[in-house]
Amino acid sequence: MKKIFILAFMTVAMLSTSCTGMLDEEVFGRPTSEEMLSNAENVAKVVGQAYAEVNWLHDHWGYWGINTISTDECVVPVRNPGQDWSDDGYWKGFNDHSWTANDVSFEYVWQFSNAGAVLCNKILSQLEPIKASLQEAGLYNRFTAELKVLRCYYYYTLFDAFGRIPYLEDYSSAAVPQSETWQVWNKLVTTLEEEAQYLPIITEQNHSENYGRCSQGMAYTLLARLYLNASSYGVTPSNCGVEGITSEKDFYTRCVACCQKVIDSKSYKIEDNFFSNFFIHNENSKENIFVIVEDGNSAFNYRDVAGKMSNKLRITNLSLNYCFQTCWNTVDKPWNGFCAPEDFLKRYEWGVDHRGPCDKNAGTHGCDGWAWFLGPVYESENSDVILKMEDKGNVPAVIVPKITSLTDATHNDGARFLKYEVDKIGANKYCDNDFVLFRYADVLYMQYEAAYRAGNDSKCSELLADSDFQKIRTRVGCSPYSSLDLDELLNERGREFAWELVRRRDLIRFNKFSMGSWDYKPKAKDNHWDWFPIPRKVIETSGGLWTQNPGYDTDK
């Protein structure tokens, strides 16, 4: 079913903006946009085009990369020094927090997030001439809300990374000054509060037609994140423009309320099987609220950076050892790169918590139903022959948790990521699993944290007694919580949402990102690393309109 929506989104060939410039256009042929929009049946497809830029966000050169590699949940060691994953120290800079404004990933996050927001604004402008007919059909608020909420998500990714960003709500080529972080937060929150009501509540009947698109559940989940993290974004009761917020506690109370709207919708539930959220066919998950729809077998689109930035999901290719191609019949040989730091793995209850590593003695014979791989890579499921890396000195492929060095690791160092089901029949070149952006488990854990911070003991007790809340742990083999403090909640969120784009902001909220220390990353002298630098090229081409974030040397 999910492929239907990919085809709908691919009507971008009829009405499109290019990613290469903020307002540059490529004309692919007829019909024109006006002709398309004259047919009300096509409006939903035209609005669906606005999701085209979302697929660029989960690449390791993009938003997913800068958020994941910069935390304690991921490391990219140089293997076979000077050859594998060196890239002149590029990945090391994210692991040890020594990045600069020249790093190309920042430029690409800036480009694609802005391009997505501009595309939303363009389509909004194209709906205005047919506003009356859409209103008559009862569709205007629905479609404009979808575009505005999706625009919020694009700007949220930009804001979450850089803080001070230009924020446009109309389709214009005019450059605008950067807004301060609290101003951006206010705009996002105000828009989401106003528009969420017009989006569909997901039901069994409308799930398919709204899959991968903005819904009320998606909007309120994003809103809850913004309220929960308000302080970490520099928002205070004094600069907050939202009526009724007079103390920091009010931010948490609003977060609790937004989460409750998602809960009360009855649209979502905690799946019995944790891994069903990440299956190749995960479109039927009742837990996933917002996903990036994937098609692992379609054409490769990329940008010319080292390794080529892609709009295809390659999360297992990034991590698995080379020999998995032989063992599991993957189309391409995996890249033997990204892995888990050993200290991060220690947060799991080994042999109990299935979100953790498999039995290191079983390897590929016993890794099904575990999120991290350790042990030998066998020739096949029924063979006891351990594969060797023939072009790497015939070293047997036996994955170990220890990483010997960030700059001189072995090819076997570091647990490999298995949360997303691997295609073992060679059906697709890229991952066909839809990439999860928002999950219901996050809603429940956010509500608990916000209630705890607000001093709402009754809500915390209510959640601890909730079967869905406790199932998050019991389904993976862990004991339910009888009590839960913030330190344990941070650890639990790390276990539950590994590599799901939440860890960096979690650490910032707990003041443990810049000021924390872990494998290869020392404690910083100040918190300026909580924000990434504005790309140097962006500043240089702004005509003096935009300035660098504090703490970064613009000459580097």
Residues of each region from the PLM?
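C-terminal substrate/ligand-recognition segments
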Residues: 103, 107, 354-468
